[in-house]
Regions:
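N-terminal small-residue-enriched
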Residues: 1-473
Length: 473
């Protein structure tokens, strides 16, 4: 089925167009982003059942205006008479300009955006609309998954969770008329178990531009998550050192996200907080590796027609056969840098500022087979079950927490597991050590990405299996 447009946004569109017309009497440029995001999260564990709003639910508006070389914004969620609202917004924005001037605070100037006229809409397709399925049916399915996991020996807690989201956005200016409605789903299973006084946990997820059909994907994860849990319960600590490793697609994705995801967010170029700014056009990785980011390069939870500034989504080649080509950018950063925006301007909500943010970030597939990659390693590990990652864009250090590593000796998996594993290194050293790339890629979109300690947005990341050399501890 095709995801329907928000009836609310369709209804209020003429009023927003009138608001823009009135504000343009006072400002040289005016745009309005209208958001209507809804969704539900269902969770069943061995001890409780909960149903609540999806994390990013919102309904509101952001006005952006340009005057005297600077942009300013006003957000609100109470839509009143257009004339009254225009007067209120004009007064607030003019007062802000005057206050800054009175205090002697210099404003960061930005060129006036030159928009091209465009009218475009997008609606994605899903199989089963969550709004046509009762909460009881969804919870019943989750309960069966929970019961199946809890039935295994040593399980202290098992939890099944699914979220259904519907994102509706309308972007209007004097030249742009953009509207989109897309749905995505996220499912996850987690288990905590114990054996011989040792306790551990495992987690698996799935996501995509899907509806209730994602529950069927979750059915296949139960036995997988239990197997991983038991492997971790029988694991040993890794001996610290440098190793040849193969990163599973989920680990590859976090490396992409941390290494040259945050590192090439171009609002950091404006602030001179990213080393990547000095390496555009230079080799930073193995010639075997290429990396992309973009809302249209892959079909996952961060695939959209336009970003929160009305820039159409793109497929950006960040690294091309080892060479750093470009970064990813919001509109205002691009205007300040004299570059082309890439459709990566995203807000946590209508109440928050736009930043350069990732969408779907991934290494592209190569030509190698996983079996051949394993056979090429004398002693190392197959790393899987990523937990978290962190990178320093200013100095290119990277750290990833990985759930487990499967030992490889003389080209074969030994059955021995080490856990937990911390992967660390200097980003160019890690990426230049890539010597094999598998022929299939996979993306994951069940998590969120923050900017520093805040500004959470939906992203996905992934890629193929990579063979590289890293430090483990």
């Amino acid at each position: 089925m095709q995801v329907p447009m928000s009836s609310y946004l369709v209804e209020i569109k003429p009023q927003i167009q009138e608001l823009i017309r009135l504000l343009e009497r006072e400002f040289d440029y005016v745009s309005v982003l209208c958001t209507d995001v809804k969704g539900t999260t269902y969770r069943v564990s061995m001890h409780q059942t909960t149903v609540g709003d999806y994390h990013f639910c919102e309904r509101g508006f952001v006005v952006r205006a340009w005057q005297d070389g600077s942009y300013t914004e006003y957000s609100f969620n109470n839509l009143t008479d257009a004339a009254d609202l225009a007067e209120k917004i004009t007064s607030a924005l003019k007062s802000e300009f005057q206050a800054l001037k009175a205090l002697g605070i210099a404003q960061m100037e930005s060129p006036l955006v030159q928009e091209e006229a465009i009218t475009k809409t997008m609606q994605n397709e899903i199989e089963i609309d969550p709004e046509t399925v009762s909460a009881e049916e969804i919870l019943s399915h989750l309960r069966k998954l929970c019961d199946a996991g809890a039935a295994h020996e040593g399980i202290l807690e098992f939890q099944s969770t699914v979220s259904f989201a519907r994102v509706n956005k309308l972007f209007l200016s004097s030249k742009k008329d953009l509207m989109q409605s897309y749905a995505f789903s996220e499912g996850s299973l987690s288990a905590i178990g114990t054996e011989n006084g040792k306790q551990n946990m495992s987690y698996r997820s799935c996501s995509g531009l899907k509806g209730v059909e994602i529950l069927n994907e979750m059915d296949a994860i139960v036995e997988e998550i239990i197997a991983v849990l038991y492997a971790k319960l029988h694991s040993d600590p890794v001996t610290p050192g440098m190793y040849d490793v193969i990163t599973a697609p989920d680990v590859t994705g976090v490396i992409a996200h941390e290494a040259f995801g945050h590192g090439v967010e171009m609002d950091m170029f404006v602030k001179d907080r990213a080393l990547a700014k000095e390496y555009i056009g230079k080799p930073v990785a193995s010639q075997l590796s290429s990396m992309h980011d973009g809302a249209v390069g892959a079909q996952q939870v961060s695939s959209y027609l336009f970003d929160d500034e009305g820039t159409l989504g793109t497929d950006t080649t960040v690294i091309d056969h080892g060479t750093l080509v470009t970064g990813i950018s919001d509109l205002v950063s691009a205007l300040r840098l004299g570059t082309t925006p890439t459709g990566n301007g995203k807000r946590e909500s209508f109440e928050r500022k736009v930043y350069s943010r990732m969408t779907n970030t991934y290494f592209t597939a190569g030509t190698d087979k996983l079996d051949d990659m394993i056979a090429s390693i004398e002693h190392g590990y197959l790393l899987e079950s990523v937990q978290s990652g962190m990178e320093d864009p200013k100095h290119w250090g990277i750290q990833c927490m990985v759930g487990l590593g499967r030992e490889i000796k003389d080209g074969k998996l030994t059955g021995k597991v080490v856990s937990p594993v911390t992967l660390t290194g200097y980003v160019p050293d890690l990426l230049k050590s890539i010597s094999m790339v598998s022929d299939k890629e996979e993306l994951f979109g069940s998590g969120m990405c923050g900017k520093g300690h805040k500004e959470w947005v939906k992203v996905s990341d992934g890629g193929p299996y990579l063979k590289c050399k890293v430090r483990l501890g």
